Amino acid sequence: MKKAQKANAERERLEKIIVAVLKASREDLDVSRAELADRLGWKPEQIAELEIGRRIVRAADLILIARALGIEPEKLFHRVMRW
């Protein structure tokens, strides 16, 4: 496998983990997609798109979502790295 292919495969793997951690964190806190969207000023569909992988989670989104859930962003990053 070429370096670029390996990098893309690793990126896709990490994106899936990030999405899984965000969704699990939201569900652990018993926060609905609609409630999280409201806290962020987003539409519930935007949360759904993130959680099903149709939208890439940018670093800024990750930080905003963590704050909206009342979680320190560092803890989310740590959870991603342990997944």
Ranges and model annotations:
Residues 30-52:
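Short alpha-helical DNA-recognition segment
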